């Protein structure tokens, strides 16, 4: 979470503080002092660091296929909320239908809303729930 949410170099938000609207080839494409990292090789539309999206879907939202069930035939949803973000909404359109993992901070608890088109194992605050297709709402204490 810290690398994702930090605004100083190196981080994913650092380029945004310098005006980026795409993913740069180098985290310091434009350095703190405003100079270019190098004038010879600076791509400002380079997906190499875009793998953070995989981390957001697979960890922050917790959406993953269950081992032994390719193509999201059965899924695991184990979200990892963080107070610094406060809320997250991710969805993935699988061949079986929409998978959605939302969480948000509500007072002193987390509210999770999980939608699954297939059987799923949903893990919230260490507790596993085996569920059928549908939309499920869970709550857990903020730690």
Q: Where are these predicted regions, by residue range?
A:
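Non-catalytic C-terminal accessory modules of carbohydrate-active enzymes
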Residues: 1-143
